[in-house]
Amino acid sequence: MNERDYRLDFCRGLALILIFIDHVPGNPLSLWTLRKWAFCDAAEVFVLISGISSYLAYGSKLDKLGFGGCCTAVARRLTRIYGAHLLLFLSAALFVRLASAYFVRVDYVDFLQVKHLFADPRHYVPAALTLSYLPKYLDILPLYLILLATAPAIIFLVKRDPWLALIVSALVYTMVRMTGFNLSAGHDGLGWNFNPFAWQFLYTIGVVVGHFSKVGFKADSLHYRYQWAWLTLAGGFAIFALLAAAPWSGTEESRALFSLYLWPAEKTFLSPLRVANVVALLYLFAFFVPKQAKFFSSRAASLFLACGRNSLPVYGVGVVLSCAGYVALSENDATNMTSVAVNVIGILSLFTLAYVLDWRRKNLRIVEASTPSNYAIALVRRFVG
């Protein structure tokens, strides 16, 4: 029986669509994404899910191949992600350069923060290659590169003592928040928008969740004994975050009061509010939605599942499309028609890309599993049955 947890692919796919929407400045649809209704946004969902997925993907490799074999498997994945980052960097930079040359309303090169690259390529090209130059919107993959590079060590520790792994991660997180230590983004005196030394805490939480999803909890564990208490706590915090952050008309005064002490929950050093909120939301989702719920077999869900299974190309294309969407909105005065077109075309493009990649992967598997004599039969069975 296939025991794949479709919730992971669905949440990752949904997060990628939300990231595209949020990355288009002035996009009216972003008023309805997670970042407007909670302390966290799609980035936290993506990192937490990535931690869970990393354990599920490499935990068994650590057992079978040892630490060295696990590192080798991770290194292969890192190579692909690094290549994708460089391709995305080049594509986005060239796109905004062409847009700035053709249009005059907005300096799109300055918007993406790549003006330094074109002004001094001899310095900034090597900086980009070493991840010491990170323009706007091009910082999630470098974060993921660093987090994934630490995955073998984190998984190794989690398998021996998950609580010790969390304590060590929390100590690093606390020290970074106290000292303000960060890596340089290489321009304008800025640091990384996603400080990896802070965001590793959320990633480690994901790895620990992945561990317990495989080994389970003891019947008398705190998880089962106080399950309804955890559910109440998660639900209560999610409601509190909604009331504090939601942009409802007439709640401006209450939001202003909350903002004095809580909001906006800063992102670079990963505010504890963001951690608590995303963990609460995913706990509620996991509690109420079975991992193979019938909903996941629907056509609508299948589109998000496909995006989740093809997260790297979907994210990269989504960033370029968000730049194109910003150009379209800026050059057409952000009319309602333009806003609808930007979102519909962008989201449908990502769904189509994910669907085509899924279709290609499935048919490659048919070819690999079939001899030339029975390939046609296998293909017919797949589409008929």
What are the residue ranges of the model-derived segments?
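Alpha-helical transmembrane segments and their immediate juxtamembrane cytosolic regions
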Residues: 1-385
